[in-house]
């Protein structure tokens, strides 16, 4: 686990996401995400790159084997919501980043609810604790009402059903991404230290031993 470090640039629009995915992840951490009656602060993210001959080759990324209908949003423009269904069950939300035409995105892994806990609980279940309502990427999408139909929307457009406001720079901890079998040791998962909403790290059983990953 690495020491806290501060991102010194505060992003204000999608133009500030035309950077490498790790920098974009820093800029999205601490952002306010709002979706269908629920508002949360982004407390955990993961960066993902792209194709082998691109600037950020990443074998763990959906875009690694090239562009297709499913992953096209990852190729830009920046600031678009890329949604996918994990294990055929859970919708997960990413924000595209990098130059238009270059694959990269940031997965929104967890949020701390600011408003709309009752609305989120109606979607997640009455017994779910507030701190856990948006913990984990599938739970976050469920809490905010994000669906596969939101794929490709502009999260910086005022009339979007899901919006992002990028706030002040935040200190961040970094470590390996959760549950992936390729590039499993890259410290491309970032989170706000001390936040109970951050999900637990779990290494994929298919990943090589720590230190042996690319």
UniProtKB/Swiss-Prot annotation:
What organism is listed for this UniProt entry?
Mycobacterium leprae (strain TN)
Family per similarity comment: Belongs to the DNA glycosylase MPG family.
The keyword Transferase belongs to this UniProt entry's keyword annotation:
no
Q: What biological process terms from GO does the record include?
A: base-excision repair
GO terms assigned for molecular function: alkylbase DNA N-glycosylase activity; DNA binding
Coiled-coil stretches: none
* Keyword Secreted carried by entry: no
According to its UniProt record, the EC number is 3.2.2.-
Q: Which UniProt keywords apply?
A: DNA damage, DNA repair, Hydrolase
Upper lineage: Bacteria, Bacillati, Actinomycetota, Actinomycetes, Mycobacteriales
Pfam families from the UniProt entry: Pur_DNA_glyco
Task: Show the CDD domains listed in the entry.
Answer: AAG (cd00540)
Q: What is this protein called?
A: Putative 3-methyladenine DNA glycosylase
Source organism, top-level taxon? Bacteria
| Listed InterPro entries | Formyl_transferase-like_C_sf (IPR011034), MPG (IPR003180), MPG_sf (IPR036995)
């Amino acid at each position: 686990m690495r020491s806290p470090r501060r991102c010194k640039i505060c992003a204000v629009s999608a133009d500030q996401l035309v950077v490498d995915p790790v920098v974009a992840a820093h800029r999205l951490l601490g952002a306010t995400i709002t979706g269908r009656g629920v508002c949360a602060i982004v407390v955990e993210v993961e960066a993902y790159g792209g194709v082998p001959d691109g600037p950020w080759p990443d074998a763990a990324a959906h875009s690694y084997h090239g562009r297709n209908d499913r992953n096209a949003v990852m190729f830009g423009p920046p600031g678009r919501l890329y949604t996918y269904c994990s294990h055929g069950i859970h919708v997960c939300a990413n924000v595209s980043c990098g130059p238009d035409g270059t694959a990269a995105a940031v997965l929104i892994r967890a949020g701390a609810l600011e408003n709309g806990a009752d609305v989120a609980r109606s979607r997640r279940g009455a017994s779910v604790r507030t701190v856990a309502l948006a913990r984990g990427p599938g739970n976050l999408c469920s809490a905010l009402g994000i669906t596969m139909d939101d794929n490709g929307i502009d999260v910086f457009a005022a009339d979007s059903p899901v919006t992002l406001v990028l706030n002040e720079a935040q200190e961040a901890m970094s470590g390996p991404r959760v549950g992936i079998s390729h590039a499993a040791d890259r410290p491309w998962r970032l989170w706000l230290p001390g936040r109970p909403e951050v999900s637990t790290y779990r290494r994929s059983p298919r990943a090589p031993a720590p230190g042996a990953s690319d």
